UniProtKB/Swiss-Prot annotation:
Protein name: Probable protein BRICK1
Assembly mode: Binds SCAR.
UniProt key word Transmembrane: no
Subcellular location: Cytoplasm, Cytoskeleton
Chain segments annotated as coiled-coil in the UniProt record: 47-81
Xref: PANTHER family: PROTEIN BRICK1 (PTHR33668:SF1)
Lineage of origin: Eukaryota, Viridiplantae, Streptophyta, Embryophyta, Tracheophyta
GO molecular function: identical protein binding; protein-containing complex binding
Species this chain originates from: Oryza sativa subsp. japonica
Length: 86
């Protein structure tokens, strides 16, 4: 039990210091929480953008692979039957 006479948390100065420290801690925690939310939002946007760009690149790669297959067939035909191109 706290004794009267200015000792312990009953002292107005100590209470003021404790309240100020509590507010500083709450502000710090609030800032951390806000920054974590911002980071999370950024990561969600980054994931969506990255998925979209990768899907676009995948489509372009598929088109290039098909074109390459056609060219390989044409080269193969030209090598086995060169008279077609003369």
């Amino acid at each position: 039990m706290a004794r009267a006479g200015g000792h312990g948390m009953g002292n107005p100065v100590n209470v003021g210091i404790a309240v100020q420290a509590d507010w500083e801690n709450r502000e710090f925690i609030s800032n951390i929480s806000l920054n974590v939310r911002r980071l999370f939002d950024f990561l969600l946007r980054f994931e969506a953008t990255t998925k979209s760009k990768l899907a676009s690149l995948n489509e372009k790669l598929d088109i290039l692979e098909r074109k390459l297959e056609v060219l390989e067939v044409q080269v193969s035909s030209a090598t086995t039957n060169p008279s077609v191109f003369n």
